[in-house]
């Protein structure tokens, strides 16, 4: 990857590059690895924590930050101080890539504007949907107006799904929007990793249908809807015992409400793939993701999926064929879908098989190349003077 006979230089700004092992951070680290392998130079600017969740890829410049109260794993960057601006000027990036619309991202965006550097943003989270989970729904309007200003000030936006790309095209202009989807590691997530002896070791009988929650245990993942669906299924006479894979500050909250759930905590690698493939149905009530990584990984593992009918899921799941989409925020709808799949094992298995086949099309090599094409479009517009003013 070259420009004017030298390596392309990219400055990536992240609110949390490796403090938490979530889908956004894993995607960004994969992207940096991909870019470096192709000869680009990448410099990452991000808050850092004393304890990281995984070894990060690339050179990280620590940005001054403070811990978010009650969520110490996340940090809030304190803007773009002079030392960081000097480092950025010395690196002289050809592109500034913003992965979050936070204070750091907005400060970097303004600096890039003043310096004449093209700005690319990638969408990873629907932050406006978080507010209702923390009693701040009244702030959604101001938040959406801020996000509109942020994305409208970008030269190019990488949307994770076609529905979101269409939404953003209507807001910010279709010529500035392209898709950066996500891939799945088929060696890590595959139906062949299902392990009946592992299920027995957790106390599950062969005939039991095991519903799975897979992801960070935080309220904004829809834990209240998951709990409601399980309790409704039990009230209907099915003593389902969910399997919970993941860790987070809401673990105790969920454990108190679902005392017979089996909590495996945080897993990685083959242990994670085995746990996912050994369940039967993924229930994903989250409406906050921009891309449903857990949906894709569970699909690759051969599970039937019950997911909220939101843009992050509807682009992956062909409802009735590779999974089931249900009205968001309706525990009753999730419970009804779960009960249908418990009653019809042939349909449940057919959904899982079709989902696993569909996941074959989601390859990291191809999705990461989408980012490079987005960079190229942005640079071409900058060269012809058709970028943002």
Show the residue positions of the predicted features.
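Aromatic "clamp/platform" in nucleotide-sugar-dependent glycosyltransferases that forms part
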Residues: 287
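Conserved acidic donor-binding segment of nucleotide-sugar-dependent glycosyltransferases
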Residues: 319-320, 324-331, 340-346
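N-terminal subdomain of nucleotide-sugar transferases
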Residues: 1-64
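Short hydrophobic beta-strand element within catalytic cores of glycosyltransferases
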Residues: 304-307, 317
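Conserved donor-binding/catalytic core segment of Leloir-type glycosyltransferases
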Residues: 204-221, 227-231
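Carbohydrate-associated surface elements
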Residues: 48, 163, 183
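Nucleotide-activated donor-binding/catalytic signature segment of Leloir-type glycosyltransferases, i.e.
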Residues: 251-271
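Short alpha-helical donor nucleotide-sugar binding micro-motif in glycosyltransferases
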Residues: 88, 266, 274-279
């Amino acid at each position: 990857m070259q420009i004017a006979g030298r390596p392309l230089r990219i400055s990536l700004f992240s609110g949390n590059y490796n403090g938490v092992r979530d889908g956004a951070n894993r995607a960004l680290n994969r992207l940096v690895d991909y870019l470096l392998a192709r000869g680009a130079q990448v410099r990452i600017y991000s808050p850092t924590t004393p304890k990281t969740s995984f070894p990060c890829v690339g050179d990280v410049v620590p940005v001054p930050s403070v811990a978010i109260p009650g969520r110490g794993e996340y940090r809030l960057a304190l803007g773009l101080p002079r030392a960081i601006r000097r480092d950025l000027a010395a690196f002289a990036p050809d592109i500034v890539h913003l992965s979050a619309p936070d204070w750091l991202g907005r400060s970097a965006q303004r600096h890039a504007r003043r310096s004449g550097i093209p700005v690319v943003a990638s969408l990873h989270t629907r932050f406006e949907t978080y507010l209702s989970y923390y009693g701040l729904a009244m702030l959604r309007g101001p938040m959406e107006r801020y996000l509109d200003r942020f994305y409208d000030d970008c030269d190019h936006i990488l949307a994770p799904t076609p529905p979101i790309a269409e939404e953003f095209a209507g807001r910010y202009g279709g010529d500035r929007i392209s898709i950066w989807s996500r891939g799945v590691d088929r060696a890590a997530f595959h139906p062949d990793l299902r392990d009946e002896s592992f299920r027995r070791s957790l106390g599950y009988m062969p005939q039991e249908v095991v519903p799975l929650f897979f992801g960070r245990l935080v309220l904004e993942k829809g834990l209240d809807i998951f709990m409601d669906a399980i309790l409704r299924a039990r009230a209907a006479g099915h003593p389902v015992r969910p399997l919970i894979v993941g860790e987070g500050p809401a673990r105790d909250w969920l454990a108190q409400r679902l005392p017979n759930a089996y909590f495996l905590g945080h897993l990685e690698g083959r242990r994670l793939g085995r746990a996912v493939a050994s369940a039967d149905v993924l229930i994903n009530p989250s409406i906050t993701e921009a891309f449903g990584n857990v949906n894709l990984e569970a699909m690759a593992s051969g599970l039937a999926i019950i997911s909220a009918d939101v843009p992050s899921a509807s682009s992956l799941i062909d409802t009735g064929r590779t999974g089931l989409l249900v009205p968001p925020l309706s525990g009753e709808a999730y419970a009804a879908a779960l009960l249908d799949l418990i009653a019809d094992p042939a349909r449940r298995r057919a959904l899982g098989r079709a989902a696993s086949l569909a996941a074959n099309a989601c390859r990291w090599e191809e999705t990461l190349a989408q980012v490079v094409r987005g960079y190229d479009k942005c640079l071409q517009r900058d060269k012809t003077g058709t970028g943002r003013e």
